[in-house]
């Protein structure tokens, strides 16, 4: 019996070490937007549950971040900057590289073949940054305020948040090939197989009501589905893939979308205050939910696993808005 207990104890310790090793084999980056006009945006870096670095005062409102190979790219919206950092197991190498976008108001990005395509509200375009030279080589003009952007490798798909369309842009020719009507206020977009999912958020003419919806484009047939949710349902605009299924923020958590674009309430992950859930995202097997009560730091990010269990809690700066992961084995 003693030998059996000892064997079980050794197995438990071994499994526990493997679990710790798995969680420690990646770095997690949390971008805190900061306060408008204050230039207090920051990036917190975690290894497992431990914060190993915080880069403060990056600029005025970090809009989005993305890991590409051993680089972290950040778009700083109201400073009109792209920040590029090399990543090591110790965190971000400082001071990094800074590229001006010439007052463009950068928003969201996608990377294709070592080129960064990013949307811009002020200049109403998609600019193209060469990630070898950090030189903005070209731009693609659009009509309105482009927001979410994804790519299938041959085309860019861009959400026009100020209107009601998705633009399909040929990467090679840099020309808009098709425009899809998807309903008011397209925001974030995500590709799931041959389907393009679109979250929508827009306001009444007097700005007193917020409306939410989801749309979907079959990228092969071009067929569009549009779903408008009932008044009173609070969705938010964030979309993500969890276990290869598309989720969106919904009433203090994230819930999967059904084929008819309705929300699967029963499968919701997270149950936070509706007014406090500021952002949500998923990378690998981590599901992030960033909360704020007053848009001032410190704020809190709750990290869930794919079963919905809260595994980590991060204390970060004001308004956590985006997330990225880098595998140390890279």
Predicted regions and their residues:
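Conserved beta-strand positions in repeat-built beta-propeller and related beta-rich domains
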Residues: 26, 30-38, 74-79, 118-122, ...
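Repeated scaffold domains used in trafficking and secretory/extracellular systems
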Residues: 59-69, 104-113, 144-153, 184-193, ...
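Bacterial Sec-dependent N-terminal signal peptides
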Residues: 2-33
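Structural motif
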Residues: 37-44, 81-85, 125-127, 165-167, ...
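Intrinsically disordered, low-complexity segments enriched in Gly and acidic/Ser/Thr residues
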Residues: 228-297
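Beta-propeller fold detector
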Residues: 52-58, 93-100, 137-141, 177-182, ...
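Short loop/turn segments that connect beta-strands within beta-propeller blades
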Residues: 47-49, 86-91, 130-134, 170-174, ...
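Blade-loop segments of beta-propeller domains
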Residues: 53-110
């Amino acid at each position: 019996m003693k030998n059996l207990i000892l064997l079980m104890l050794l197995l438990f310790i071994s499994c526990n070490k493997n679990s710790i090793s798995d969680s420690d084999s990646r770095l997690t980056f949390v971008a805190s937007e900061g306060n408008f006009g204050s230039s207090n945006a920051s990036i917190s870096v975690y290894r497992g549950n431990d914060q190993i670095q915080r880069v403060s005062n990056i600029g005025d409102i970090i809009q989005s971040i993305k890991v590409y190979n051993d680089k972290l790219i950040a778009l700083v919206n109201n400073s009109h900057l792209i920040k590029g950092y090399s990543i090591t197991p110790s965190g971000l190498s400082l001071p990094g590289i800074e590229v001006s976008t010439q007052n463009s108001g950068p928003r969201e990005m996608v990377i294709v073949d070592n080129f960064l395509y990013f949307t811009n509200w002020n200049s109403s375009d998609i600019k193209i940054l060469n990630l070898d030279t950090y030189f903005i080589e070209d731009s693609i003009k659009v009509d309105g305020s482009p927001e979410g952007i994804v790519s299938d490798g041959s085309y860019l798909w861009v959400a026009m948040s100020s209107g009601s369309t998705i633009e399909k842009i040929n990467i090679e020719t840099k020309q808009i090939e098709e425009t899809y009507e998807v309903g008011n206020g397209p925001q974030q977009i995500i590709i799931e197989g041959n389907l393009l999912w679109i979250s929508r958020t827009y306001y009444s003419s007097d700005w007193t009501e917020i409306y939410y919806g989801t749309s979907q484009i079959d990228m092969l047939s071009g067929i569009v589905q549009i779903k408008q949710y009932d008044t009173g349902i609070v969705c938010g605009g964030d979309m993500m893939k969890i276990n290869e299924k598309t989720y969106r923020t919904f009433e203090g958590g994230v819930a999967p979308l059904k084929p008819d674009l309705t929300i699967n309430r029963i499968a919701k992950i997270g149950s936070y205050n509706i007014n406090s859930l500021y952002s949500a995202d998923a990378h690998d097997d981590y599901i992030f939910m960033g909360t704020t009560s007053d848009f001032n730091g410190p704020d809190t990010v709750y990290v869930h696993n794919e079963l919905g269990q809260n595994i980590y809690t991060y204390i970060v700066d004001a308004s956590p808005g985006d997330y990225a992961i880098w595998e140390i084995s890279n």
